[in-house]
């Protein structure tokens, strides 16, 4: 690690990303499954986006939120692609201080964006069940709410107070047992006062994931109450199947997120290998699983994909 001396104190100019601890000699082979994961992410979410864009029947609130979710997942994966493949495929383990601080702002912004889309996606079937006659006004309302929340989140991250406080705290962290840098371990290893970082982090998590979790629980409670009131067994089965795919999507976001938070709270007791595996699951599990879940569980998406493939086959 190279250290420079400036007005902020002693600052490291480069960090070393270990990747997966204990498997440094196998990084070339490890790059193969990671490359396949990225192919699945971009291909799967790209197909979802293409199908929703081209099929007019899918231009409905529920599928528009699904498109937002897929787009957010593509952005998260694209932001980690250079670092991850750089480590495993090319052995480029050094990262500059600027490149280290940049994901601290970028990754939470994209991931919070995706989690908010997942929460908003729940309100599509809820609103259509409770107000079926007013469904035509829902896309405009949803779009306005999404843009306002997007703007506020962007405004929080654009001020850059957290990144500046990290630099002012003079980080001394020569090695990171992950394929990317997380703000939690960075803050613990800083040499200055990190109270602002901790308060800001708690506020962001509470106002995004905490609020999303509460709204999701309330929404599914109302959906379940509505579904149980459906007279026909076929309609009940269809509604429960749709809700099941939504639950899988939400769990794909929140389970790795909660697991990684617990691991980092107990970081001094947990092996670096487990931390690395949890961190990678946190980044890669939702983008990989969600396209598979929706292409299988959602009948409309599945049918649109089949029609697209059959049309491509006839053209060939």
UniProtKB/Swiss-Prot annotation:
It holds the Pfam family 7tm_4. Residues 1-31, 85-104, 183-191, 264-275 are extracellular. Residues 53-63, 126-161, 213-242, 297-316 are cytoplasmic. Keywords: Cell membrane, Disulfide bond, G-protein coupled receptor, Glycoprotein, Membrane, Olfaction, Receptor, Sensory transduction, Transducer, Transmembrane, Transmembrane helix. It is a multi-pass membrane protein. The keyword Transmembrane applies. Glycans are attached at residue 5. Its main location: membrane. The chain crosses the membrane at residues 32-52, 64-84, 105-125, 162-182, 192-212, 243-263, 276-296. Disulfide bonds join 100-191. It is found in: Cell membrane. InterPro entries: GPCR_Rhodpsn, GPCR_Rhodpsn_7TM, Olfact_rcpt, OR51/52/56-like. GO terms for molecular function: G protein-coupled receptor activity; olfactory receptor activity. One of its GO terms (cellular component) is plasma membrane. One of its GO terms (biological process) is sensory perception of smell. Belongs to the G-protein coupled receptor 1 family. Odorant receptor. This is Olfactory receptor 51J1.
């Amino acid at each position: 690690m190279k250290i420079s001396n400036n007005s902020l104190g002693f600052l490291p100019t480069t960090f070393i990303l270990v990747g997966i601890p204990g498997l440094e000699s196998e990084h070339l082979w490890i790059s193969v499954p990671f490359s396949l994961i990225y192919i699945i992410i971009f291909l799967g979410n790209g197909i979802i986006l293409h199908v929703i864009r081209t099929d007019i029947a899918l231009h409905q609130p529920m599928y528009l939120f699904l498109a937002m979710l897929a787009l957010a997942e593509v952005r998260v994966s694209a932001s980690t692609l250079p670092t991850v493949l750089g480590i495993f495929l090319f052995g480029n383990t050094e990262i500059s201080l600027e490149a280290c601080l940049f994901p601290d702002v970028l990754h939470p912004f994209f991931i919070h964006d995706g989690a908010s889309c997942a929460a908003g996606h729940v309100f599509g079937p809820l609103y259509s069940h409770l107000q079926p006659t007013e469904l035509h006004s829902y896309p405009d309302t949803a779009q306005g709410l999404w843009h306002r929340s997007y703007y506020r989140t962007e405004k929080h991250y654009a001020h850059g107070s957290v990144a500046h406080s990290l630099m002012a705290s003079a980080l001394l962290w020569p090695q990171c047992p992950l394929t990317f840098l997380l703000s939690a371990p960075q803050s613990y290893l800083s040499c200055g006062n990190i109270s602002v970082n901790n308060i800001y982090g708690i506020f962001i998590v509470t106002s995004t994931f905490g609020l999303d979790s509460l709204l999701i629980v309330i929404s599914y409670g109302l959906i379940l109450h509505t579904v149980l009131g459906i007279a026909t067994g076929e309609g009940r089965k269809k509604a429960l199947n749709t809700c099941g795919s939504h639950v899988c999507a939400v769990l794909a976001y929140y389970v790795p997120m909660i697991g990684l938070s617990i691991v980092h709270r107990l970081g001094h007791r947990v092996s670096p290998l487990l931390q690395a595996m949890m961190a990678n699951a946190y980044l890669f599990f939702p983008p990989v699983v969600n396209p598979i879940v929706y292409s299988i569980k959602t009948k409309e998406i599945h049918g649109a994909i089949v029609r697209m493939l059959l049309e491509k086959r006839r053209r060939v």
